[in-house]
Amino acid sequence: MRLLVVEDETDLAEAVARGLRNDGYAVDVAGDGEEALDKLGFNDYDLVCLDITMPGIDGLEVCRRIRSDTTRDPSPRVLMLTARDSLEDRVAGLDDGADDYLVKPFAFPELLARVRSLLRRDAGTTTATLRVADLELDTARHVARRDDRDLELTAKEFALLRYFMTHPGQVLSQETLLEHVWDEHADPFTNTVRVTVGTLRRKLAVGDEPQLIDTVVGRGYRLTDDGDALGDATPS
């Protein structure tokens, strides 16, 4: 999942971004509303952590523009991060399109829990554990299991599997995976996605269990619930 942190306090922005990256998310940072809108115009984000009080374009206006952008469907989830704690401020943020509202100062574990909760809404689940076939992913404890056996995954492999499991059965192009699992510093001209999918696929191969990730020729990859290729899908 790819996140955008919009915060004009540099130390706080970097601390939040570092914590989110340590949890396996791809994170970009914007220091003000104008930079945030520039990044939102070029990149697809799953969630935006958005400060309200910023010089120039404030967070409320950024949120309104996110919600008015009809070219993004779905538009990213928005988590407001602000020192404004009055009822009126919270209502204004939610009415302008925020999905959740967290008052500063906050404990990072709570921020992380709220991020997971918002992203679960798009995955259609109410718990921190994702399940596809005999594959289980505990996003809170960072534990991946298949057929009751623990899988040793790197942070990027875990993030990639999490994205697959929140989009089961969907064909995901390399461009889509690069956009949502890697940050803006990833080189789009490398074979990073193909290599990471390949290593993840090998780690998911437990015993005689069927392969869960198919290559759909000319289109991308798909996580199936039984490992059977569909249509023009062929394993690679």
Predicted region positions:
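Nucleotide second-messenger and two-component phosphorelay signaling modules
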Residues: 71, 123-127, 208-210
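A short linear beta-strand->loop->alpha-helix hinge motif most characteristic
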Residues: 211-236
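Positively charged, aromatic-enriched patches within helix-turn-helix-type DNA-binding elements
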Residues: 143, 148-155, 159-212, 217-219
